[in-house]
């Protein structure tokens, strides 16, 4: 059974904090919500390997499930690489590449961003400097071959990260601890160039319109049929910063992989994003696909023997 960890707990609150109404049931903790979602994943997307981490940036309350488990990072890691480039190069140099990275997840532009930093080894030095010990760039061969000599290769030839590392990074980005004010603001704006919903925008699909519009995120996907071994890949990651109605924000990483049914895995990620928002926004009326969840998620995809998988790439 997965272990659910409460990293930081609640920061000290002022003595004038609003008290719950007399007789009202105690509010469910973020830890309990995350634990419930982990249980749902086994029912809604059997076979999916899930890691999830979330931090309420208003209070510091943070919970995770399998938060240190390594996952293939796919394109979600590109936010690390652009941040590293902004720490070394001026905005004018980074901007043309970063806009492609976030607008269309351009892989060749991402390789050029890695080159701006000094190559894969330099990216890993940057990550270690931030204390992200469970994240590494191993190779990036778009445009040309790039191999790291200092990757621990925890996942063989694949690039990887973990949910806890990503949420830690996003929280520090939001607190303006990683970069100077101007590049920080620009990186956050670039994170709004990504899809708002649907393929590549799973984090926003079931959020209210206002939250979807202001969403700052980066999806990463390696869908069935893309990479030669669906049992290893079928990667669907979403990482980002979400704004709540009171102006507060939270950082979230939902990492799902290896699920044999892509639509079921995608539905779970969309629903998990919505359920977390509903809890943190205290919006009990928000529909996170309840009827579909009660039905077990989307109908299973059944393929004839030898038939190719549907094209689930974001084109």
Where are these regions (language model features)?
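Bacterial signal peptide processing site
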Residues: 17-19
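Positively charged n-region of N-terminal signal peptides that target proteins for export
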Residues: 1-4
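Hydrophobic helical h-region of N-terminal Sec-dependent signal peptides
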Residues: 6-10
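Active-site SXXK
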Residues: 60, 70-92, 101, 252
